[in-house]
From Swiss-Prot:
InterPro entries: P-loop_NTPase, Sigma_54_int_dom_ATP-bd_1, T2SS/T4SS_dom, T4SS_GSP_E_ATPase, VirB11. NCBIfam families: VirB11. One of its GO terms (cellular component) is type IV secretion system complex. It holds the Pfam family T2SSE. GO terms for biological process: secretion by the type IV secretion system. One of its GO terms (molecular function) is ATP binding. It is found in: Cytoplasm. Transcription of the operon is maximal in early exponential phase. This is Type IV secretion system protein VirB11. Belongs to the GSP E family. The VirB system could be required for the establishment of the replication niche in the host. It comes from Brucella suis biovar 1 (strain 1330). Induction: Specifically induced within macrophages by phagosome acidification. Induced at 37 degrees Celsius in minimal medium, suggesting that nutritional stress is a regulating signal. ATP binds at G182, E183, T184, G185, S186, G187, K188, T189.
């Protein structure tokens, strides 16, 4: 008697063809997709590929990987997963036929004439706890302590000594989360660009802005993402600062550089920064360092999910996530010109808040 194999599904011919189309368009990337030592394959613009091997990025020129081919890859992938990618829906998240995760961003959400493709290869590595022990995996666990780390002590000493240039340089190098605050015309964006120059050139950077200002001529592994300035998450706009922040989580950034926080995307910024993406730099309008936290909390409340949180919880999260606030001012009336008026850095408060929560739980 023949058994009824109801769990065996034969893919239909159309699905097979769609998968074959995706695999055909992936052929220029096949050498790296098939390399077991490579974990991430990224295309920032036509003709070039960046691959991550052993936590380091490698660059490869691929002349035949042109714009039209990348557009076709996006279309084939969208059809495979029964989704859409177009000028009006320029961001696509999908799983490829062989199980890789892919994130595609096309114009107008990225630079004209470029397409961002990020492919995360699934890991088939298996380790036992004994394997981890032999590799020294458990040797660097830090106990929860009220004392500051050596890096925190170093930054605090620089700030207390008034050596603000060295303080900011080290804060960037140590991947602190930095918010530049000030009024309109105070020089926030210009200072942000100066801080970005202190980022190591081998890191992968993603910028998010509505107007192209954050140029990265010295960082080859970068992607510029754009959203319409009038786009609002509350109105279900397809591309907003918030949707691009969430997209970044699938694009393997070392750092995310958001030109300005204006509204509900502050909630997503907190999530991104709290998820381990250190070194993010952004700006906002605020009259002082302390008011920066109030302004950011009010922005979080503009988010559907953010407004479900009590105000004090939001403020606590901000103090835990934001490491440095730099307030800039344009002294047009007293002749002092553009300058830094305040710097907030308080690791002791951050540590106390963290320990307070741990003791309660």
């Amino acid at each position: 008697m023949m058994s009824n194999r109801s769990d065996f599904i034969v893919p239909d011919e159309a699905a097979v063809k769609r998968a074959a189309s995706v695999n055909f368009h992936l052929e220029p990337l096949r050498p790296w997709l098939d390399d077991p030592q490579i974990t991430e394959v990224c295309v920032n613009r036509p003709g070039e590929v960046f691959c991550e091997r052993a936590s380091a990025w490698e660059y490869y020129a691929v002349p035949n990987l042109d714009y039209e081919h990348l557009i076709s890859l996006g279309t084939a992938t969208a059809r495979f997963v029964d989704q859409d990618i177009s000028d009006s829906r320029p961001v696509l998240s999908a799983i490829l036929p062989m199980g890789e995760r892919i994130q595609i961003v096309r114009p107008p959400a990225c630079e004209h004439g470029t397409i961002s493709v990020t492919i995360r290869k699934p890991s088939f590595t298996r380790r036992t706890l004994e394997d981890y022990a032999q590799q020294g995996f458990f040797k660097h666990v830090r106990p929860m302590s009220k004392s500051l780390t050596p890096f925190e002590q170093e930054l605090l000493a620089l700030k207390e000594a008034g050596d603000y240039m060295s303080f900011l340089r080290r804060a960037v190098q140590l991947e602190r989360v930095i918010v530049v605050a000030g009024e309109t015309g105070s020089g926030k964006t210009t200072l942000m660009k100066a801080l970005m120059q202190e980022i190591p050139f081998d890191q992968r950077l993603i910028t998010i802005e509505d107007v192209p200002e954050l140029f990265l001529p010295d960082h080859p592994n970068h992607v510029h993402l754009f959203y319409p300035s009038e786009a609002k998450e509350e109105e279900n706009a397809p591309v907003t600062a918030a949707t691009l922040l969430r997209s970044c989580l699938r694009m393997k950034p070392t750092r995310i550089l958001l030109a300005e926080l204006r509204g509900g995307e502050a909630y997503d910024f907190i999530n991104v920064a709290a998820s381990g993406h250190g070194g993010s730099i952004t700006s906002c309008h605020a009259g002082s360092c302390e008011l920066t936290f109030e302004r950011l909390a009010l922005m979080v409340l503009q988010n559907r999910q953010g407004r479900q949180l009590p105000y004090e919880i939001i403020r606590r999260l901000l103090y835990l996530v934001v490491d440095v606030v730099v307030h800039v001012h344009n002294g047009v009336h007293d002749g002092t010109g553009r300058h830094i008026s305040e710097v907030w850095y308080d690791p002791n408060t951050k540590r106390a808040l963290s320990l307070q929560h741990s003791e309660k739980t």
